[in-house]
């Protein structure tokens, strides 16, 4: 459960990300594909090279989903319901991959905003990414 402080920390980080969200989404995917190569199996039709148009396009979708979750931080479940259906029923992505994505996103934030990622903010952002992952895997049962 995200506390009021967690929600404020997450919103603060996303305000710093601002117009870079799409780029950070793509960078997160690139990192995930390198660090966790098994995640590539869900993207057999993608050009997975650095800077590819497909990674940029999907990174934009990832970023949009995260921004949507932040914008509806009191109802992440409602905000990501359709995306949860898609991942559970059609794409059938292994739930562990959302943890990988969350970790890679934290790394990207740390690289671009090291001063903003205090231990408290890091913990809040990690809790937020876990909450997003939980919502995206809730309909797998």
Swiss-Prot record:
Keyword terms: Heme, Iron, Metal-binding, Oxygen transport, Transport
Gene Ontology cellular component? blood microparticle; haptoglobin-hemoglobin complex; hemoglobin complex
Tissues and organs where the protein is expressed, per its UniProt entry:
Red blood cells.
Statement: the UniProt record of this protein carries the keyword Heme: yes
Q: Which residues bind O2?
A: 58
- UniProt cross-references to InterPro entries, sorted A to Z: Globin (IPR000971), Globin-like_sf (IPR009050), Globin/Proto (IPR012292), Hemoglobin_a-typ (IPR002338), Hemoglobin_oxygen_transport (IPR050056), Hemoglobin_pi (IPR002339)
Q: Which GO terms describe its molecular function?
A: haptoglobin binding; heme binding; iron ion binding; organic acid binding; oxygen binding; oxygen carrier activity; peroxidase activity
Q: Which domain of life is it from?
A: Eukaryota
Q: Does the keyword Protease apply?
A: no
List, for all copies, the residue spans of the domain called Globin: 1-141
Q: Name the residues that bind heme b.
A: 87
Q: Which GO terms describe its biological process?
A: hydrogen peroxide catabolic process
**What does it do?**
Involved in oxygen transport from the lung to the various peripheral tissues.
User: Family per UniProt?
Assistant: Belongs to the globin family.
How does this polypeptide assemble, per the annotation? Heterotetramer of two alpha chains and two beta chains.
Full protein name: Hemoglobin subunit alpha-A
Gene that this polypeptide is encoded by: HBAA
């Amino acid at each position: 459960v995200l506390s009021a402080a967690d929600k404020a920390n997450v919103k603060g980080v996303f305000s710093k990300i601002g117009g870079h969200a799409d780029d950070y989404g793509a960078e997160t995917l690139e990192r995930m594909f390198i660090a966790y190569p098994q995640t590539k199996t869900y993207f057999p039709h993608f050009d997975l090279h650095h800077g590819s148009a497909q990674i940029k396009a999907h990174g934009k979708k990832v970023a949009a989903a995260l921004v949507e979750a932040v914008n509806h931080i009191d109802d992440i479940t409602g905000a990501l319901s359709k995306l949860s259906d898609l991942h559970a029923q059609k794409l059938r992505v292994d739930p562990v991959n959302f943890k990988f994505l969350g970790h890679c996103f934290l790394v990207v934030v740390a690289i671009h905003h090291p001063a903003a990622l205090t231990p408290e903010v890091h913990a809040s952002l990690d809790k937020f990414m876990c909450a997003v992952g939980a919502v995206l895997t809730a309909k797998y049962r």
